[in-house]
Amino acid sequence: MDGIVPDIAVGTKRGSDELFSTCVSNGPFIMSSSASAANGNDSKKFKGDNRSTGVPSRVIHVRKLPSDVTEGEVISLGLPFGKVTNLLMLKGKNQAFIEMSTEEAANTMVNYYTSVAPVLRGQPIYIQFSNHKELKTDSSPNQARAQAALQAVNSVQSGNLALAASAAAVDAGMAMAGQSPVLRIIVENLFYPVTLDVLHQIFSKFGTVLKIITFTKNNQFQALLQYADPVSAQHAKLSLDGQNIYNACCTLRIDFSKLTSLNVKYNNDKSRDYTRPDLPSGDSQPSLDQTMAAAFGAPGIMSASPYAGAGFPPTFAIPQAAGLSVPNVHGALAPLAIPSAAAAAAAAGRIAIPGLAGAGNSVLLVSNLNPERVTPQSLFILFGVYGDVQRVKILFNKKENALVQMADGSQAQLAMSHLNGHKLHGKSVRITLSKHQSVQLPREGQEDQGLTKDYGSSPLHRFKKPGSKNFQNIFPPSATLHLSNIPPSVSEDDLKSLFSSNGGVVKGFKFFQKDRKMALIQMGSVEEAVQALIELHNHDLGENHHLRVSFSKSTI
C-alpha cells in the first residue's frame, strides 16, 4: 500500500477491487475536484503503485515527502533527466506524482534514484513508476499552486535557450524558488586541480551557467557561480552538494549566496562571463567588487592562486551527502553526463562521484534477453559503448540470461544505469550486479556452443587509452547516432541505404559542417538505433575505414 489518494471519479465511492482495476487499466490519473479530501484525512486507499520500481511509465510516484516540501523541490527531482510536464501534489499524504515528457527520461530518473537514495530537506524519499500513463489535474487550490510552479519552471527553461533569459522568466523562477540564482561553492580536500572549466562542465548539466568567479579564501578553493535562474541553482545544489569530483577528494560544499548577481570584469582562467565574450582577459586574476567583498567579509582582491595553502580540512559531513554516498553513485550520475575534464579523470582512474573509481563488482547479470537473437558479440558491442567489455557468457541452460564482465566496477555501473530497461531484440532487458566476481571461461572439452567469449584483448575497446576522449561522449541510448571515420567517397545516400538495409527507418541525416568524416543519423526509434549500432559499429566502409557508431545527445 502506498498511501491515500482521492477517488478517481467525482461523487462515487468505489470498493477497493473496483479502484484497483481502474488503476491498472493504464489510463490517465484524473485528479478530481475532491482533491482537498486527499490532502486531509480521507481514508480511501490507493492500491495501484504497490511495486518496488514497477513497469516503466512517464508518471513517477514519490512517497514519504517532508510535510513542508515545496512544489519547486519536487519538480527539481525530475529536472536533471528531462522536462517535467505535469505535477500532482498530495501534501496531506506526503506524496506526489511527477509526469516526465518521455518514458526514457522517467526510466533514467528511476534508475538513478534506485542507486542514489533521494533526499529532500534531510529526509530520504521513495520513488517508483506509477501504473498511470499520464496525469490530468483539476483546478483546486493545491493543484493550481503546483501548476503555477510548473509553468514558472518551464518558462525559465524556455528562457535558458538563450543566455540572456527573459526577466519575466527569471522573476517567475525566483518567486517560486525564493532564493538566489548564485551558488557559493567550496571545494574541500583539493588534491587535484579544479579549474573554472571543470566547474562549468559539471554545473552546466543543471541549467545555463552565466558567470563564474573562482578565488581562494582561508586556504580553500571557492567559487561563485550564477545560473540564469534560481530553479537551476536549486536542483544543482540538491544533486551535487556533498559529491566528490575525484576519487576520495575534491568534495563540493554548496550553499546559496547572498548575492543575486555577479559582476565579472575579466574573462580568464579565474573568472568568466559567458554572456560577455568581449571582456578583456585582464591579469588572470579576478577582482570582486566591494559589494561582493562585503558579502564574504573578504578584501577586494582574493589570493592569486586557487591552490595556495597546504592544509586542507577533512571532508565536511553533510546530511544529504549520506544519501548520495553509496557505491552506485558513479553509474547513477552517468545519465547526467558529466564530461570532459572530469571524465578524463575517470579514464585515469581518479573520478569518484563519489567513492567509486574501479572499485566494486564489475560483472553484470543481464536478463530478459531474446534467446533466439542475442549473441555474445551483440552484447559486447552494446555494453562496449559504456566501458571495455572483458568477457561475455550467455547461460547455456537459460539463454535469456547472460553475464557481462566490464573492466571495472565504475564501467559496470555506467552500463547498468544507461541500458537497464531499454529494448534489445524486442525485449526490455533487466540489468543488475552479479554475485560473481568474474566470468569463467569453459574448461577444455566442456560443451559451450560458443556462448562464452573472451574480449580482453579486443581492438574494439573504446576506452583502452588513458584519458581517452571517448569518456567525454558517453550518452544514454537515443534515436540519434553519431557516426565517425567516414571516408570521403561515402555519400549521404550510401549511409542512409546502409542503415535502412536491416529494416530500420532513417528519419534524418546530417554531415558535420566542418568535418565530413562525422555525421548524425536519426533512426525511427531508440530500439532501432540500438540495433543499428550493434550491427554497424566497425562496419567496413572501404579505403581502410571502419565506421564508428555511438549514441548522440543531439537531435537533427
Curated annotation (Swiss-Prot):
It comes from the Eukaryota. Residues 35-54, 436-458 are annotated as: Disordered. Signal peptide: none annotated. The modification N-acetylmethionine is found at residue 1. Its main location: nucleus. GO terms for biological process: 3'-UTR-mediated mRNA stabilization; cardiac ventricle development; gene expression; IRES-dependent viral translational initiation; mRNA processing; negative regulation of mRNA splicing, via spliceosome; negative regulation of muscle cell differentiation; negative regulation of neuron differentiation. The modification Phosphotyrosine is found at residue 126. InterPro entries: HnRNP-L/PTB (IPR006536), Nucleotide-bd_a/b_plait_sf (IPR012677), PTBP1-like_RRM2 (IPR021790), PTBP1_RRM1 (IPR035000), PTBP1_RRM3 (IPR035001), RBD_domain_sf (IPR035979), RRM_dom (IPR000504). There is a cross-link at residues 64, 217 (Glycyl lysine isopeptide (Lys-Gly) (interchain with G-Cter in SUMO2)). The modification Phosphothreonine is found at residue 137. The modification Phosphoserine is found at residues 16, 140, 458. It is found in: Nucleus. Residues 58-142, 183-259, 362-436, 479-554 form the RRM domain. Gene3D superfamilies: 3.30.70.330. Keywords: Acetylation, Activator, Isopeptide bond, mRNA processing, mRNA splicing, Nucleus, Phosphoprotein, Repeat, Repressor, RNA-binding, Ubl conjugation. One of its GO terms (molecular function) is mRNA binding. NCBIfam families: hnRNP-L_PTB. Monomer. Part of a ternary complex containing KHSRP, PTBP1, PTBP2 and HNRPH1. Interacts with RAVER1 and SFPQ. Plays a role in pre-mRNA splicing and in the regulation of alternative splicing events. Activates exon skipping of its own pre-mRNA during muscle cell differentiation. Binds to the polypyrimidine tract of introns. May promote RNA looping when bound to two separate polypyrimidine tracts in the same pre-mRNA. May promote the binding of U2 snRNP to pre-mRNA. Cooperates with RAVER1 to modulate switching between mutually exclusive exons during maturation of the TPM1 pre-mRNA. Represses the splicing of MAPT/Tau exon 10. PANTHER family: MATRIN 3/NUCLEAR PROTEIN 220-RELATED (PTHR15592). This is Polypyrimidine tract-binding protein 1. It comes from Rattus norvegicus. The lineage of its organism: Eukaryota, Metazoa, Chordata, Craniata, Vertebrata. The gene is Ptbp1.
